[in-house]
Amino acid sequence: MSLLLLVVSALHILILVLLFVATLDKSWWTLPDKESLNLWYDCTWNTTTQTWACSNVSENGWLKAVQALMVLSLILCCLSFILFMFQLYTMRRGGLFYATGLCQLCTSAAVFSGALIYAIHTEEILAKHPSGGSFGYCFALAWVAFPLALVSGTVYIHLRKRE
C-alpha cells in the first residue's frame, strides 16, 4: 500500500510540475526567427544584446480563456494534492478519495479545454504575427499533463485507504 501511495504522490507531483512549466514557461508557439510566444508574453531573441525582449501578448478573448483554464488547472491540481494529504491523515480506514479524484478529473478537463482551445484558435490568437512556426514544448507538456491527470483522478476515485 505504501508503494502505491508513493507512486500516486509522485504522479501527482509530476503533473504539478508539468502544469507549472506549461503555464509559466515561454514556448507555446515558436516562430522560425527565434520568436517565442507563450500564454503571457511575446518574446523575441535580440541577437545584438543576446537577450530576450518580451512584450505582453494580444488581448484576444480565446487566449484569455486559455490563460484562465491553465491557471484553474494549476489551482485544482494543488487543491487536490492538499486534499489528498488531508484525507490520507484524517480519513478512516476503508474510505475512498472521491474528493481528490474529482478535483483531479476537473484538472484534466481544464487542461484539455485550454489546450484544445489554443489548438483550434491558433490562427486567431496569432493573427498579428507572421505565418509559419509550430507548437512549442509547453503546448506539448499541457497535452501530456491531460491524460496523466485523467489517470490520476481515476486512480484516486478507486483508491481505498488501508492501514
UniProtKB/Swiss-Prot annotation:
Glycans are attached at residues 46, 56. One of its GO terms (cellular component) is plasma membrane. It is a multi-pass membrane protein. GO terms for biological process: apoptotic process; bleb assembly. Probably involved in cell proliferation and cell-cell interactions. Belongs to the PMP-22/EMP/MP20 family. This is Epithelial membrane protein 3.
